[in-house]
Amino acid sequence: MEAPICLVENWKNQLTVNLEAIRILEQIAQPLVVVAIVGLYRTGKSYLMNRLAGRNHGFSLGSTVQSETKGIWMWCVPHPTKPTHTLVLLDTEGLGDVEKGDPKNDSWIFALAVLLSSTFVYNSMSTINQQALEQLHFVTELTQLIRAKSSPREDKVKDSSEFVGFFPDFIWAVRDFALELKLNGRPITEDEYLENALKLIQGDNLKVQQSNMTRECIRYFFPVRKCFVFDRPTSDKRLLLQIENVPENQLERNFQVESEKFCSYIFTNGKTKTLRGGVIVTGNRLGTLVQTYVNAINSGTVPCLENAVTTLAQRENSIAVQKAADHYSEQMAQRMRLPTDTLQELLTVHAACEKEAIAVFMEHSFKDDEQEFQKKLVVTIEERKEEFIRQNEAASIRHCQAELERLSESLRKSISCGAFSVPGGHSLYLEARKKIELGYQQVLRKGVKAKEVLKSFLQSQAIMEDSILQSDKALTDGERAIAAERTKKEVAEKELELLRQRQKEQEQVMEAQERSFRENIAKLQEKMESEKEMLLREQEKMLEHKLKVQEELLIEGFREKSDMLKNEISHLREEMERTRRKPSLFGQILDTIGNAFIMILPGAGKLFGVGLKFLGSLSS
């Protein structure tokens, strides 16, 4: 993108998603690092974001007391250090703009920035003091503006206890900072400055409680915190009015150094935007999230992460089924030369392509808890396999009929000119027909319908052969009877040979179905184990953070608040234990994937038994 575009418009107190911005996001298949900046209006947020983009111009700065940015603006740029990622910068409307009609929109802008970003930058002026913390009261409203789960928890634990599992990293950017970084006479880092400012203070009055609430929320919701303090870019007020046009060498050296540190930190440490369960957010996924959240706000409900992920999963999993099925069809078409000599040749290619297709689906799908979409894939691939089998059979029939047409041309001419209407004509006819059969045997790649087409050809000749046999004056009645019996025997042998081929092909189809069933179950088991490990890692991180906060509160002298976390920590430990001991879901898998096979595949009762045996071997 050459310039930013409005992502969420804020017009007359109504939030609207800009569909042009969504179309841009839909073109980005890479994972995203999403950096959002929030803060009071006219505090230099846009200028800082332009520096992240490596440009002087981009997000509009303005030079008056009026807020320039309205809604949320987006700028997608190549990530400077991660070529496989796209950096998405979100510049938000300034908080506290006196020209706004409804201050509630400030809260929604703040909440959207938290929900959409992987790194959340709060921008303020001068120092982190009581006033700065009061201005950040929006963080205390997040419990009313965001929900993690779609329904209340049965264990009565607050929904906000889940926030730590999906909230972004938090950066506090302090602009025009003129103080010395010292505490009790010793130098401290910016991070230590922030953590000291976030320590709770003793006191029971309302003002202290409110500022402590802000401190608690920041510490509790945002496990990863960082602070940067910036000098004023220039002491020349005239240059400040047109700061975007000021060359780098005219900026204060300290500002340059701190800006470089800030950008370098985000480029190096800014994490990929992910959802619960390790779902990586790409451009099109971010677009879906934006629309889902804004629709929820406009409908009067609270944006819910679980609902958003479910909406996203429905859309993405449908696409994953299509992508996997298309991969199957494309690879089958590329690797097969019709007609194949045998059905097994086709089924071998099918097995390889199906395995790849399942892998494609697993890679692009998530939260398919009931295996609804994997079941659709099973059905779709089976339908497409059957279509390839039909195409293969049709190609074999066309090829064989064409070859028999060519080989039997002389026979037809001989019949037309009466060459077999002579004594000994039946013997001559049999020789001519045998020559056709021998020539047919030499034809390459006749395909799976070779015997069937030959049988049809011979059947079409039966009346003519009998006519020639009956009119052959060189034969006695006994010899005619023997010849007729021999012909019947040959027909029966060919019928038996064809039946054996069909039985063999049916066995091959059953083997292919069993292999397909095993492949689906194995891949699903692998994915479920991976998701279980991911969930445990997330829970372990949450537990580690809650224990850290609990210990800090105890050290700071807030035992009551520390004790209040015990219930959450206890419930989280119970959840982790349930996750570890989660019973096998193979029965559920069999109900879904197995039923898909039972509905669409011949001989599925046998296959179902194979599935039970296979699942037993996996779960033992």
Curated annotation (Swiss-Prot):
Named from the GO MF annotations, one term is: GTP binding
Q: Which Pfam families match?
A: GBP, GBP_C
Q: Which InterPro entries match?
A: G_GB1_RHD3_dom, GBP_C, Guanylate-bd/ATL_C, Guanylate-bd_C_sf, Guanylate-bd_N, P-loop_NTPase
What is this protein's expression induced by? By IFNG/IFN-gamma, IFNB1/IFN-beta and TNF-alpha. Up-regulated upon infection by T.gondii or L.monocytogenes.
What's the main place this protein lives?
cytoplasm
Q: What class of enzyme is it?
A: hydrolase
Which UniProt keywords are listed? Coiled coil, Cytoplasm, Golgi apparatus, GTP-binding, Hydrolase, Immunity, Innate immunity, Membrane, Nucleotide-binding
Catalytic activity, as annotated? GTP + H2O = GDP + phosphate + H(+)
Q: Where is this region: GTPase domain (Globular)?
A: 1-304
Q: Which GO terms describe its biological process?
A: activation of innate immune response; adhesion of symbiont to host; cellular response to interferon-beta; cellular response to lipopolysaccharide; cellular response to tumor necrosis factor; cellular response to type II interferon; cytolysis in another organism; defense response to bacterium
Q: Please name the SUPFAM superfamilies in this protein's record.
A: Interferon-induced guanylate-binding protein 1 (GBP1), C-terminal domain, P-loop containing nucleoside triphosphate hydrolases
Q: Where does GTP bind?
A: 39-46, 61-63, 91-95
* Coiled coil spans: 375-411, 477-582
What are its E.C. numbers?
Answer: 3.6.5.-
Q: Which residues form the GB1/RHD3-type G domain?
A: 29-271
Q: Which family does it belong to?
A: Belongs to the TRAFAC class dynamin-like GTPase superfamily. GB1/RHD3 GTPase family. GB1 subfamily.
Q: What's the subunit arrangement here?
A: Heterodimer with other family members, including GBP1, GBP2 and GBP5. Dimerization regulates subcellular location.
Protein name as annotated: Guanylate-binding protein 3
Q: Which organism is it from?
A: Mus musculus
